[in-house]
Amino acid sequence: SNRIDIERDSENTNYFCVPIPPSVRVENVTIENHYMDRQLWVSIEPEKMQDEEAFYEQNGVYGNCEKVVDGHFEVERKRICLQFQLTDVYEYRSIFEDNTLYIEFVPPREVYEKIVVIDPAYGREDTGAATESVASKDITLNVAKALKEKLDKTDIKVYYTRMDDSNPEAERRVGLAEAARADMLIRIEVNSAESSKQYGTEAVYNSRFFIPGFGSVELADLLEREVVTAISGKANGLIEASAEDTVISEATVPAAAIKVGYLTNGQESILLQRED
């Protein structure tokens, strides 16, 4: 990938300014917030690729660049992708005019009143407990996707630590909740046991940080009751997070993990694989 020139001492403005090739219309520009990586991507798909590559070799970004660490661009067959590394997790507002994309970076708290981070456990080679037909990493991801469908219809802003088969380090998962100043961090896990007779739902809470009002214990209790009610399941109670529960024990925002069921129990294993 090629570096994008950043003019740091440019004019006094609130906006980070990205020049767009003259042949490109607004509907050919897409912005993606890769908040887990603290990156903002601007994708440009011109009607036909001309000398767009040369355009970014000659034209840098300018304006208010204090939240931008650096920038690169990659040219693919039909599109150019500009990738900007940011100093933190931000939301953005954008305006496109005179072939310039004006971007304003805003802390999530300035835009949203309610912020939640959902953390589907496991990922990649860390499958979690697995049977011949399914791995825990897929169950937690499916639960997150189902939650997204519901939560997208509310006024709650939700950040997800993963939405594919990736496995971010525990520090990055916790870091997202801290950076977004989330009201709560909810981790989704799957249980397993030696005995196939064991079943039910448990919630793990962070006991290290006492948060008055609505804290980790209250969150864990609420999660367990909601899940048990929704699936007509059995509540096994609340468990204090141990040092191994890094994501929950390191968080300084209210944090709890909901262990949705036992993959080692025949009946629950079937339930966990159902679409609904």
Where do the model's predicted regions map?
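Active-site histidine-acidic residue metal-binding/catalytic motifs
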Residues: 100-176, 180-184, 199, 205-207, ...
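Active-site-adjacent substrate-binding region
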Residues: 215-241
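Short linear recognition/processing motifs and adjacent strand/loop elements at protein termini
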Residues: 1-117, 124, 135, 147-149, ...
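Solvent-exposed loop/turn segments at secondary-structure junctions
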Residues: 123-125, 163-168, 190-195, 209-211, ...
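Surface-exposed patches in mature extracellular/periplasmic domains of secreted proteins
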Residues: 29, 156-164, 188, 231-240
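Active-site-adjacent loop/helix surface patches within enzyme catalytic domains
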Residues: 169-193, 229-233, 244-252
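Active-site-adjacent mobile loop/cap segments within catalytic or ligand-binding domains
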Residues: 194, 237-276
